Design a protein with these regions (language model features):
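Conserved N-terminal beta1-alpha1 strand-loop-helix module at the mouth
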Residues: 1-106, 111-139, 154-160, 164-174, ...
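A short, flexible beta-alpha/helix-coil linker loop
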Residues: 146-148
């Protein structure tokens, strides 16, 4: 059964329009000062979308790091997206999250985050998952496009998945993740 479509709100449409260009994902960094320095450098270099992802941190460290990142992202006018933990995002007033298949119900997350929230979903290499989630998601992510040191067991997704999904005219931004670097980014952007 397909999820019920959710209403579009101007704030949500504006956030969705931000999903383009290079999208940075933080490293699993335990040192908040080092994380902030790395993020500051990336944002000063032009990154306008940042996903906070720290699979090794406990909830206290995640909260501390997000509280520190939020004003940095606001100062740089960068969209801050929280990976996995929509409850923590809601607690901190962050309106954007990225959810994998085991991260909870999208509609429950949207209700907690508010109607203007932005929710991206991992589709891995599944065109069917993209089609099923497009009515309730704001962007669709595919990957790992390349081998990744941070997620060595990630499911591979061929670049051809983008053409397949674009042919469906789902009207959602598409995001490629996993192992993208200076050597292969050209093939992703093509």
């Amino acid at each position: 059964m397909l999820p019920a479509p959710s209403s579009d709100y101007p704030e949500r449409q504006a956030r969705r329009a931000l999903i383009h260009g290079v999208y940075a994902i933080t490293a699993d960094e335990g040192d908040t000062a080092r994380l902030l320095a790395d993020v500051e450098a990336a944002l000063s270099g032009g990154i306008r979308i940042l996903q906070y992802r720290n699979k090794h941190a406990d909830i206290a460290l995640k909260r501390q790091q997000l509280e520190a990142l939020k004003p940095v992202c606001e100062r740089h006018q960068t969209l801050l997206i929280v990976n996995d933990d929509w409850r923590l995002a809601a607690e901190l007033g962050i309106k954007a999250v990225h959810l994998g298949e085991d991260d909870g119900d999208i509609e429950e997350a949207r209700q907690a985050l508010g109607p203007g929230s932005l929710i991206g979903v991992s589709c891995y290499a599944s065109v069917e998952r993209a089609q099923a989630l497009a009515p309730v998601a704001d962007y669709l992510a595919f990957g790992a496009l390349f081998a990744s040191g941070t997620k060595p067991l990630a499911r591979p997704a061929p670049l051809s998945v983008f053409r397949e999904v674009q042919a469906l005219s789902l009207a959602r931004p598409l995001v490629g993740i996993g192992g993208i670097d200076a050597d292969n980014i050209g093939s992703v952007l093509d």
